[in-house]
Swiss-Prot record:
GO terms for biological process: DNA replication initiation; regulation of DNA replication. Residues 358-485 are annotated as: Domain IV, binds dsDNA. This is Chromosomal replication initiator protein DnaA. Keywords: ATP-binding, Cytoplasm, DNA replication, DNA-binding, Lipid-binding, Nucleotide-binding. It comes from Borreliella afzelii (strain PKo) (Borrelia afzelii). ATP binds at residues 185, 187-189.
Amino acid sequence: MEKSKNIWSLILTEIKKELSEEEFYVWFENLCFLESVGDNIKISTPNLFHKNQIEKRFTKKIKEILTNNGYDNVTIVFTNQSPKTYSSKEESEKTTFNETFPTLDKLKGTTLSKEPLQSIKDRIKMYIKKEEEPKNFKNPFLKKRYTFENFIIGPNNKLAYNASLSISKNPGTKYNPCLIYGGVGLGKTHLLQSIGNKTEELHNNLKILYVTAENFLNEFVESIKTHETKKFKKKYRYLDMLLIDDIHDLQKKEGIQEELFHTFNALYEDNKQLVFTCDRPPSELTNFTDRLKSRFTRGLNVDISKPNFELRVAIIEKKAEEDGIKVPKNILNLVAQKVTTNVRDLEAAVTKLKAYIDLDNIEIDIDIVEKIIKEIIIYEKETTNEPSNKINIENIKKILLRELKIAHKDIEGHSKKPEITKARHIYAYLLRNFTELSTIEIGKIIGGKTHSTVLYSINKIDRDRNKDKEINNLITELMNKIKKN
């Protein structure tokens, strides 16, 4: 036992030579010699975090010290087991660090920091957790109903699904950070929650937190009011995985953006997984700091678009099965044909069908389905300003084709003739200025173009208007005619 204590004291002496006073205090002052079994020397750490960090930072150096001093066969084993769990006999035999090596108080002199010891202790409280960390970090916002197994995969979301599943299996590796973007009700939250649930299942030792951007903001504001910002930072910067939903809700909120920036850096630099969802690509976020947007684009940005007909049918079938109702094929196809907005609206249609069956005890016919569809479409228009978008799109297209003498099939086709390409650039620019459509939605309207292509078109017309008077006059004339209609 005495030999083992001497070996541990030797290790401390050698490491002390290479660390600053504060580093040495942070990592080694609270270590405690527990016991030696054979060639294993067991050392107690204050908590699991401390244990993991000690092993990560100093294992190589400790092995080097042992080898250089002829103790190749000796192994230092760190544990977060408390010395209090040992018997009184073992307690009387163990030697703490303070007994085998001088404390900072004894070491104080001209070579040490002039800063008071208590001040050092206060500063490092943010760095070392003094309390034992829970083995399982419970996340109150993760809902078990969201799983990869009940997520319906189609061409519109397959890439996002595969990336999300990969993240769950190997967090903090390939796709970090990851940002999933797309319109309302397309499954972003489902995937984000599924990542949390699957990761918790596969890696139950990890600390995973799912929050909406609104919750994140509210917590931050509350921490300022109660003077507990340190607690807020500590909560979010010791995570293994942070999932934030609807990041676009933080637009125009500089204070929380600043906090998110530093939280992002702290986690990213420690290879912790970050996943966000947004209703648009990062480049389209307004009143959002450039340095934060650049952080989002470091990893994978993947979009989810509206479901095609086949996927809409599959979604309705699955929802009907879950609700225990049988939907005739003609009814199912009618709903899938008419409700083209998103998954949420499709499920709402099935819920309404179930209500008619359960509450009114009637058979579903075409008239009832038409009524349900009409209610959903009217509500969708009211909440998304869709009428003005649809009117504008038709007006824009009509005026553009007429003024530029371009055929309908060409503007939405793949012709690379200069005049057609130019017309597409203008079309994208006008759609961007007269509607609330995202670049992804605009891309689909003008022939399946990508977000990057649409953004290029918009920026090109912007540049051309500034340097080409003829182009500027043409765009101004087109915009005036669209406004009149």
